[in-house]
Amino acid sequence: MINISLFVDISQPMFNDRAKAYYNCYRDFASAHILTLRDAIQAAIDIFEQTLEQAVKYEFVDLTADISRELRKLYGRASGDPVKHERISKIHREYEKKKHLEMLALEHYESLINYYIVKRSPSKEVHKLASQYFEELYPIAKEANTSQYYYYTYTIGLIRHFSANDTIGALKLVEEALEILKEKKYQQSIIICFGTSKDSLYYPIATI
């Protein structure tokens, strides 16, 4: 099964550009690791650099942090180029921070979903918790500036409005999210999710 997974036919229609890039990036990341173990350092650096470019382009935050960490070590030990080392170190710090912020947003999102859907908690309790989380996450959204962070944060914001039956506030928030996410052209599933929410919110407003 492991061997088969390395030879997936990503030319099939089910794979969009981002899915293809995801598979290729992780495959190449593993290949570069193997080259490092075999002391083929320059070849490993070349593959890591190429993969890093794709990981940044398609917003694979965890992978970007991992690749930049490996490159940071390789440039520190092998290349003797302080400019390259500082460039990669900066990318590593930036994406470790993004990774941390995404994890914070995910934890708040999962906690709230547990109250909102699983426990079926009273609306006042959900509204209070959603407001607390949103007010923590929203001001630092630009520091993260990732699609996943925006998704978790704005979904929490929507739950805050829904729990207070505030349709107008929810619609304004969805429109704000879509305005930000339209720049993230490789995250169509998240854009579609908020677009669907926007359409569903227009109907009750139109019937008031």
Give the positions of each predicted feature.
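Glycine-rich, often proline-containing surface loops adjacent to acidic residues and nearby aromatics
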Residues: 26-28, 149-158, 197-200
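The canonical alpha-helical register within tetratricopeptide repeats
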Residues: 50, 90-91, 136, 176, ...
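N-terminal low-complexity or simple alpha-helical regulatory segments
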Residues: 77-80, 88-94, 137-163
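Structural signature of alpha-solenoid helical repeat junctions
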Residues: 23, 59, 63, 149, ...
